[in-house]
UniProtKB/Swiss-Prot annotation:
Protein name from the UniProt record: NAD(P)H-quinone oxidoreductase subunit I, chloroplastic
Annotated membrane topology: Peripheral membrane protein
EC number: 7.1.1.-
Binding site for [4Fe-4S] cluster 2: 74, 104, 107, 110
Cofactor info, note text: Binds 2 [4Fe-4S] clusters per subunit.
SUPFAM superfamilies given in the database record: 4Fe-4S ferredoxins (SSF54862)
Family: Belongs to the complex I 23 kDa subunit family.
Disulfide bonds: none
Root EC class: translocase
GN (gene name): ndhI
A Gene Ontology biological process term: photosynthesis, light reaction
Record's function text: NDH shuttles electrons from NAD(P)H:plastoquinone, via FMN and iron-sulfur (Fe-S) centers, to quinones in the photosynthetic chain and possibly in a chloroplast respiratory chain. The immediate electron acceptor for the enzyme in this species is believed to be plastoquinone. Couples the redox reaction to proton translocation, and thus conserves the redox energy in a proton gradient.
Amino acid sequence: MFPMITGFMNYGQQTVRAARYIGQSFMITLSHTNRLPVTIQYPYEKLLTSERFRGRIHFEFDKCIACEVCVRVCPIDLPVVDWKLETYIRKKRLLNYSIDFGICIFCGNCVEYCPTNCLSMTEEYELSTYDRHELNYNQIALGRLPMSAIGDYTIRTIMNSPQTKIKTSMDKPFDSRTITNH
């Protein structure tokens, strides 16, 4: 008889605890209803990347000494380095350097361990194509400097309009058009 009474007490405690958890979750949900949506309309407004963002790799052909450190530290042996040994000067001459960004995991090991700093990570993240073979960049494509996000005209609207400058009338409901089209 006593186990039955303690069972009912445990059931009652569990019911109260479940109701409290449901109430807490509703309070959290309702606290988010007063916030304005933070949405970036991607093709027209671009995301500002952080300083440590790991985007497309930039390659400087003149600095490379064909040491192949980038290939050895890459977890997937991705960079393809073609070189020829110049016997009269006893140095390697770089012929071709390429990286396939369809396979690259953007870990940044090649950039970190390069002894001549000929590799660097850029803030470019728009690498999507319809054909995966277009993601295989040679030394010419890797040497192309990316367009800075700060100088891009589509970024200016985000940088110059903090949340405090947005003016909307209180009778209009808040939606994505109200915030982005000021």
